[in-house]
């Protein structure tokens, strides 16, 4: 098909370039929205994609979804032909896995080393910002990464993110004071957020829907292992060497990942956008409001959970202005005529909205378990950092294995809805079983409850992501994945903060009227001479953590109910291989 062969069609070159594939033919054409609709296959009625949609992944003038969305016809994004580049997957996938491993590892690797770092740098009460700076920067950068990868190209954003991560790691290892360390952790977080976002998008670019679950399963296993191995690695390095090597160790590993991707990653070329067009069409109001809102809201949560003074003016200002900025972002996305950061049309379908919300709830539960089970083992069972990590291995191993099995199962059965529903049912049972974890519960019994919960959490990593990617056409995957990961990270951040609130308030209530207060270590509690008082305090700490698991139950219940509203899309996609001889292509960015 060649658009120029139609004598009656006047194409407007100012509307941008569109990449369109029919069978084995891939052509460039300049087009209006109506012209694109004319040229689409007859079966593909669900989406109206403009020329700018293919460049930015969003539409500056019209909704990305046509009025068909309100009808009862089936949305079938898989009718869009995906043009795949040729890649040596046995090299590219390990390169992507290495980068994901580093990004996930640095979220938790410092947890067991914080006391050593604070003592060495005289950190005092600012210790919490060592972890918060990373997660805050990582979460706030996510909306920007997806849209920029559409503007300047995937490779530029991915490689820049890895370089920023490595630079931040080197500077963290060289830090001489807490301010230096916290600022460089933020640089690390920006790089880590870009890595997380771009790896997900690149996987979607180089794999068809029918085999994609296998590769996302590999990434899920990598993420899960890195998250739980972090405390073990951090504790071992800080005890056996210097805490600075927690950061320096990233350099050779990250350098290898960068080299593999630079030399072996191939992507289908994308249209380039001039700086003038970028300034004219980019949604600066949207990116500023969402970034500011996320930062203010997460800072408010962090300060509130750290100090416990939720009614303080500073905390309320952060939270209120953060919510207002996020609300302003939502309003802006509905009415802006520029390229949207996150299209509201994606949330007009109940199925996709359910997936987005359940992703938030899933990571809320995952974060509460990941962060507060070690508190149980250390403060109540008397474990050290390393042994605490060993006792959480059942959570890590089972969750990672189920993530891989789930991905392979989806790829084999071509169905993500049933694994999603099954995962939520098991997760509800697992969170319910964790309510039975008391002060005197056997370690083996506790690990069994954790393993059951891990079956549920691990089974949900892949279905949610695949459901998002299967529900939108290829042009919208980047921004949809960014929205998915933003909500996922927000769920994790809210889970950590709410867990702290529940724990602190419950512990304060249980110890009220006694001479004991919150913040006691295991050795301090164990040294209480009166046996009945000692058991009372241990039970108070165990019940405070138990309240977190009680709250997780209704959260899991809501997630289970929402999973039934998820629609199963066809996991098959027409694929054509990109060849260097294809005309009209520029170098891949």
UniProtKB/Swiss-Prot annotation:
Pfam families, alphabetically? MFS_1 (PF07690)
List, alphabetically, the Gene3D superfamilies matched: MFS general substrate transporter like domains (1.20.1250.20)
Instruction: Give the CC-aspect GO terms.
Output: endoplasmic reticulum; plasma membrane
This protein's source sits in the domain of life called Eukaryota
* Location (main, coarse): membrane
**Keyword vocabulary terms for this entry:** Membrane, Transmembrane, Transmembrane helix
How is this protein situated with respect to the membrane? Multi-pass membrane protein
InterPro entries to which the protein is assigned, alphabetical: MFS, MFS_dom, MFS_trans_sf
Report the record's Gene Ontology biological process terms.
Answer: basic amino acid transmembrane transport; transmembrane transport
> Which is an annotated GO molecular function term of this record?
transmembrane transporter activity
The family note in this entry says: Belongs to the major facilitator superfamily. TCR/Tet family.
Annotated protein name in UniProt: Uncharacterized transporter C3H1.06c
Provenance organism: Schizosaccharomyces pombe (strain 972 / ATCC 24843) (Fission yeast)
Q: What is the lineage of its organism?
A: Eukaryota, Fungi, Dikarya, Ascomycota, Taphrinomycotina
């Amino acid at each position: 098909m060649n658009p120029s062969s139609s004598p009656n069609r006047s194409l407007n070159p100012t509307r941008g370039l569109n990449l369109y594939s029919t069978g084995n033919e891939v052509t460039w054409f300049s087009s209006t929205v109506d012209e694109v609709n004319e040229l689409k296959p007859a079966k593909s009625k669900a989406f109206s994609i403009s020329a700018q949609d293919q460049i930015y992944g969003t539409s500056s003038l019209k909704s990305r979804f046509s009025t068909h969305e309100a009808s009862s016809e089936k949305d079938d994004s898989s009718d869009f032909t995906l043009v795949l580049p040729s890649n040596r997957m046995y090299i590219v996938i390990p390169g992507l896995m290495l980068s994901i491993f580093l990004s996930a590892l640095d979220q938790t690797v410092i947890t067991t080393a914080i006391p050593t770092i604070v003592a060495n740098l005289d950190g005092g009460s600012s210790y919490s910002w060592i972890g918060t700076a990373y997660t805050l920067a990582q979460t706030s950068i996510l909306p920007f990464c997806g849209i920029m990868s559409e503007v300047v190209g995937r490779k530029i954003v991915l490689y820049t993110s890895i370089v920023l991560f490595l630079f931040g790691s080197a500077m963290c290892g060289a830090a001489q004071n807490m301010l230096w360390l916290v600022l460089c952790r933020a640089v690390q977080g920006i790089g880590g957020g870009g890595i997380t976002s771009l790896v997900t998008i690149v996987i979607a670019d180089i794999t068809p829907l029918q085999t994609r679950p296998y590769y996302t399963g590999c990434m899920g296993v990598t993420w899960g292992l890195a998250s739980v191995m972090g405390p073990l690695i951090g504790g071992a390095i800080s005890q056996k060497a210097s805490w600075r090597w927690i950061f320096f160790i990233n350099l050779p590993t990250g350098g290898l990942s960068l080299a593999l991707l630079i030399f072996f990653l191939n992507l289908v070329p994308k249209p380039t956008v001039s700086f003038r067009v970028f300034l004219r069409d980019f949604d600066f109001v949207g990116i500023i409001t969402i970034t500011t809102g996320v930062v203010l809201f997460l800072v408010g949560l962090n300060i509130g959970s750290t100090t416990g003074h939720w009614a303080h003016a500073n905390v309320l200002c952060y939270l209120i202005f953060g919510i207002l900025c996020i609300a302003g972002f939502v309003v802006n996305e509905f009415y802006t005529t520029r390229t949207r950061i996150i299209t509201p049309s994606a949330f007009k379908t109940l199925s996709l909205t359910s997936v987005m919300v359940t992703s938030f709830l899933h990571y809320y539960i995952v974060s509460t378990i990941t962060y507060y089970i070690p508190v149980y083992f250390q403060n109540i069972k008397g474990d050290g950092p390393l042994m605490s990590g060993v006792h959480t291995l059942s959570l890590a191993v089972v969750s990672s294995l189920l993530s891989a099995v789930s991905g392979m199962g989806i790829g084999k059965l071509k169905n993500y809805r049933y694994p999603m529903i099954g995962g939520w049912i098991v997760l509800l049972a697992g969170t319910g079983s964790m309510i039975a974890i008391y002060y005197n519960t056997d370690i083996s019994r506790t690990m069994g409850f954790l393993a059951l919960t891990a079956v549920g959490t691990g089974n949900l990593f892949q279905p949610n992501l695949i459901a998002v990617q299967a529900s939108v056409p290829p042009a919208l995957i980047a921004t949809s994945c960014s929205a998915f990961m933003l909500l996922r990270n927000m769920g994790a951040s809210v889970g950590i903060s709410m867990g702290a609130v529940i724990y602190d308030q419950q512990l304060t209530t249980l110890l009220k009227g006694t001479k004991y207060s919150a913040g006691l270590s295991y050795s301090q509690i164990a040294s209480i001479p009166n046996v009945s008082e000692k058991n009372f305090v241990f039970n108070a700490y165990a019940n405070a953590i138990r309240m977190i698991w009680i709250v997780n139950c209704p959260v899991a219940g809501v997630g289970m109910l929402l999973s039934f509203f998820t629609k199963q899309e066809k996991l098959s996609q027409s694929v054509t291989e990109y060849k260097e001889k294809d005309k009209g292509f520029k170098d891949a960015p």
